[in-house]
Amino acid sequence: MKKLIMVLLVVISGIAKAQTSYKIGDIATDFNLKNVDNKMISMANYKEAKGFFVIFHCNQCPYSKAYENRIIALNAKYASKGLPVITINPNDPAINPEDSFEKMKIRAKQEKYTFPYLVDDTQEIAKAYGAKATPHVYLLKKTDEGLVVSYTGAIDNDTENVNDAKIKYAENAADALLAGKEIELAQTKAIGCSIKWKKTAQ
């Protein structure tokens, strides 16, 4: 009987965790995370923003590296329109030391990041958002009710950045959001490396 109860508790716990993944239309939580300049960053700091690209990103994943310039380009194109990029590294550096906070600082300086690169050292934000991979994009729209999840998934459909005819999912969603139109494709699959969870955080 005790074993059955334990199994049920594990199943219920798993369901509860699965329910924390954001869906389109959900209100996303804000955060207060440390940036590579050692300052704490919250979306509440951006008083004039219309929304945000929140992108789970890291140092060591080949997919994150492949998309790095495109993430920089997203910020260059949309920050001035009220949709700045905020990147968050959720990985456990105990699994891969390349994702340590010190290495994050080096990477951001080396690649000339123009946006915050935050460390989610407790992994609570990644779990709350339901992030699956790096990179994983969440486009949030600022409303009176809160930050509404308007798009989630991949940046585009070209992981190797070799196809001029790529479908720019994140840009298309942002353009629709800014124009006050419905986002035709609001969810895609995030293609990247799995997040390196702490053993106690899985």
Labelled PLM ranges:
Residues 1-21:
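Bacterial Sec-dependent N-terminal signal peptides
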Residues 19-44:
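N-terminal "domain-start" segment that seeds a small globular fold
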Residues 42-65, 174:
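Short active-site neighborhood of thiol/selenol oxidoreductases, capturing the structured segment around
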Residues 49-51, 80-85, 112-116, 134:
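Loop/turn elements at helix/coil->beta-strand transitions in domains of secreted/extracellular proteins
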Residues 58-67, 137, 193-196:
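Short, thiol/selenol-centered motifs that function as redox-active sites or metal-ligating centers
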Residues 65-110, 121-127:
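Structural microenvironment flanking redox-active thiols in thiol-disulfide oxidoreductases
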Residues 105-141, 145-149:
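Short, internal strand/loop/helix patches
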Residues 139-202:
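Thiol-/selenol-based redox modules, centered on thioredoxin-like
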